[in-house]
Amino acid sequence: IKEMKLENLAARNVSELSGGERQKIAIARAMAQEPGMIVFDEPTGNLDLANEELIIQEAKKLAREKNIAILSSLHDLNQALYFGDRFFFLKDGKIKYAGGEEIITSDVINDVFDVNMKIITLDNKKIIIQGD
């Protein structure tokens, strides 16, 4: 509870918690078990932006400290860039691209998602935006 900054929720009844608060507790419970790997499906889907960033930062920190691998499915590619260090892109149910951040190019994104996107760099970070 303390590591995920959830002390303010400890005394509350579960029925009083919002969906986002329940999501944060579920993630904290999974991390507390110190498994070898955790699988997240849209781990920040019910969270506001402030809590989304907190969860990502704390999950990354705990994963490093406790040597836990995190496998996460995300539809927000910018969040994936922030969260991950290895990436797998599926197309037609098969892994089409795999690797580190270097595989994330406009060509790969446009191929996998059939959209016109481009990647820009801002403050040494890749950001995916709608293409022209």
Language-model segments: residues:
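Conserved ABC ATPase signature
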Residues: N13-L17, E21
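Hydrophobic anchor residue at the start of the ABC signature
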Residues: I27
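Catalytic Walker B motif of ABC-type/P-loop ATPase nucleotide-binding domains
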Residues: I38-D41
